[in-house]
Regions:
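Amphipathic, Lys/Arg-enriched alpha-helical "gate/interface" segment within cytosolic domains
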Residues: 1-135
Length: 135
């Protein structure tokens, strides 16, 4: 498990679980994205479970667009299940649209159990960016 202010990463089976919490403000490169990339060298996986129910996105419209793009760029290489609250759906739906437009595989769920069930039914492939590492 890896914890930093605002998020926690937990490897579980063949899935990396990400728990975001607190107020999410504009940052040029969110620490969670850097941490997920770093964790791939220790726990290579193609599956992410992202629980954002405890996160509050405090962003201006242009910042929301930039954050959605940053998140989508990272998630597009994974099979991803997102758990969110109804009031977060607007932003999360926008992220999902961007991931799908990039040929990524992502779904939104209201509960962790449903998200885990779906992820377990998905093939456990590594992200394309990690699958062909030179020896």
């Amino acid at each position: 498990m890896y914890t930093e202010d605002g998020f926690e990463l937990r490897p579980l089976g063949d899935t990396m679980e990400i728990y975001a919490s607190g107020e999410i403000f504009h940052e040029p490169e969110p620490p969670v994205i850097r941490s997920i990339h770093r964790m791939q060298s220790h726990f290579p996986t193609g599956k992410l479970l992202c629980d954002v129910r405890l996160a509050a996105y405090i962003l201006e419209p242009d910042e929301r667009e930039e954050r959605a793009t940053q998140i989508a760029d990272m998630l597009k290489d994974f099979t991803c299940a997102v758990i969110c609250m109804t009031e977060q759906r607007n932003f999360i739906d926008h992220v999902v649209e961007k991931v799908v437009a990039s040929q990524g595989k992502i779904r939104i769920f209201p509960s962790k159990a449903e998200a885990r069930d779906w992820l377990e039914s998905q093939p456990g492939t590594l992200p394309a960016s990690r699958a062909h590492r030179p020896a």
